[in-house]
Amino acid sequence: MEFPCTLTLKELLESGAHFGHQTSRWNPRMKPFIFEEKNGLYIIDLAKTLAQLKKAVACIQTTIGQEKSILFVGTKKQAKQIIREAAIECGEFFASERWLGGMLTNMATIRNSVKTLNRIELDLEASNSGLTKKELALLAKRHRKLLNNLEGVRHMNSLPGLLIVIDPGYERIAVAEAGKLGIPVMALVDTNCDPTPINHVIPCNDDSMKSIRLIVNVLKDAVIDAKKRLGIGILSPVRPAERPAEEAVEELPLPTGEAQDEASSKEGFLLWADIDNCEALK
């Protein structure tokens, strides 16, 4: 049984989903989804928005049924918090702060950045790391930046089966990477965007928080519904790192004298070298 998309034209209208961009900023390839031009703005055909949204829901259910993950992408100001909350609630991955180049096409580099994040967390938790207060403060600052950029993908160990994107023009690098790898892209597309590289177009106002939230919530609910019907647990993408037993923080006696200086210098050198080469901090 498919997830019933109960969203109405009235709700879309009230959210402002029908407002496109100025006629001078349109992309002709969006013409099939435009209802009319009014007062210098293009008005999106919400009947087509609703029809496309129902197709999108079916696609999401198929993706979950194939046991593939979904990556929500929305780094613009209006979308980032909505994307983060929705992804966490339905247990899927997200990129809401910054799209790191190679997040899909060079996953090995991103995984190395995640390892650096995990290692920094271990050092911050250990009371005998051998680091000075200044080094610990710098480490904490870099940890915040790393966590900010990697929070939603730190557990993404394989390529997603679907990207859900807010404004493919703004997220063109993410869309291009997905295209290179043959990963289908679903996107909220405004009248100024090129829908050509998008597999599942949802025409709507992608600058209005009300419009974004309304549509993203439908997509999120479709994910949750599919997982419940299939008995798939919802695991938060922002859970702490899963560490093997040998990586657990261990309290060891501190070395003394020259041995302490040597250990601190060696560990510190390796640590800062790893951090300086970390892609997510650039």
From Swiss-Prot:
Keywords for the protein's UniProt record, in alphabetical order: Ribonucleoprotein, Ribosomal protein
Molecular function (Gene Ontology), one example: structural constituent of ribosome
Keyword Ribosomal protein in record: yes
UniProt-annotated stretches for the region Disordered: 245-265
Annotated InterPro entries: Ribosomal_uS2, Ribosomal_uS2_bac/mit/plastid, Ribosomal_uS2_CS, Ribosomal_uS2_flav_dom_sf
Record-level GO BP terms: translation
One GO cellular component, as annotated: cytosolic small ribosomal subunit
Family designation: Belongs to the universal ribosomal protein uS2 family.
Protein name, UniProt field: Small ribosomal subunit protein uS2
Organism (species): Chlamydia trachomatis serovar A (strain ATCC VR-571B / DSM 19440 / HAR-13)
Gene for this chain: rpsB
